[in-house]
């Protein structure tokens, strides 16, 4: 709401206004050069100013030519009004779907036909077994060894935590163990057995 100004021979004034309770405010003098808060322009950094001042079209292109170029660049099979209401990412996704429709079915059919060709049927007709391992399902002994090493490391860490907890209880640093801490202490034997078994296997 803009403030009503009254001009007099002595300068500008904000007119006297009535408060909700019925009393009147005095007219107030406005200093020269004062700009009310509502009329102060909002701060814009240099990037905002740059993009506001940037033209929509490339230099030298007329608006008529730009409209023709936009019509020619439309995606086939999609109405113009549908494209106009979409965001950049939605438009990009639509283009990807179009590409997948053009390329996708052939590659899926090839994969399925290869899988069917490699299948062999047992004599009784009940069991179906693949002739060879499918891609990605090969057994890798190095990954199994790495997995065992990871398990051993985890168990050793848990045992170390149990030992530290036991030392704190013995020294009196922890006066009484909580339910979770007691469960942790109870699992120590099981963890040691599991560690021995893993070390024997490896």
Curated annotation (Swiss-Prot):
Subcellular location: Cytoplasm; Nucleus, Nucleolus; Nucleus, Nucleoplasm
Domain of life of the native organism: Eukaryota
MF terms in GO: ribosome binding; RNA binding
Protein keywords: Coiled coil, Cytoplasm, Nonsense-mediated mRNA decay, Nucleus, Translation regulation
An annotated GO BP: nuclear-transcribed mRNA catabolic process, nonsense-mediated decay
Coiled coil: 142-200
Biased composition (Basic residues): 89-102
Gene Ontology CC annotation, any one: cytoplasm
Main location: cytoplasm
Ranges for region Disordered: 54-73, 86-143
Entry keyword ATP-binding: no
Role description: Key regulator of the exon junction complex (EJC), a multiprotein complex that associates immediately upstream of the exon-exon junction on mRNAs and serves as a positional landmark for the intron exon structure of genes and directs post-transcriptional processes in the cytoplasm such as mRNA export, nonsense-mediated mRNA decay (NMD) or translation. Acts as an EJC disassembly factor, allowing translation-dependent EJC removal and recycling by disrupting mature EJC from spliced mRNAs.
Similarity annotation: Belongs to the pym family.
Subunit structure: Interacts (via N-terminus) with magoh and rbm8a; the interaction is direct. Associates (eIF2A-like region) with the 40S ribosomal subunit and the 48S preinitiation complex.
Designated name of the protein: Partner of Y14 and mago A
Protein's organism: Salmo salar (Atlantic salmon)
